[in-house]
Amino acid sequence: MCCRYFIEDTTEMQTIIGDMLRSSLVQKWNALSPIKTCGEISPTDIVPVIASNLSRQRAVFPMKWGFTGKTLLMNARVETAAVKPTFREAWKSHRCIVPASYYFEWEHLINQNGRKKTGDKYAIQPQGNNTTWLCGLYRFENDLPFFVVLTREPGEQIRFIHDRMPLILPEHLVNEWINPDADPAELVKAAVTDVIAEKAI
């Protein structure tokens, strides 16, 4: 699961944000709600997201986190996204990358009564990286783009925290992931699992 992440004010993120500001969608979204470009990000926030433009070139667009419906959908399981009606079209051709500095996860524990409880909050990111490239899917609702973050089984280092983690790719595969002609099932095999987790203050 992934329900929070953080954007730090780094040179790389500033470049991504600068690219986003060229999008005509900025004005449309700002008329509804401010775009968040730093700090802790939550579902329903509007944030910078990398995707292909109409010319199939890499671009950055403001998108809102969560598919709307009976309940807000903020995540999609990578194991079933290709077949679930809600996600299968986006899986084929509307893939995106959500740039983050790191994501947050809370320990899921079992108390003495066998009930689940929430433990410590952790900040998690790939080993040796300042930017975390979260894989997502997007769709249009009322002519505006909305996205979900894909999740997968966790790596061994963080299995004690949660039974899911976001699908993360190395930077060199970002352009391939957003390419509508690429095979996402093949790219998933290159997912990053070597991550570090530190307790968040």
PLM features: residue spans?
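Short linear sequence motif anchored by a di-proline
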Residues: 1-201
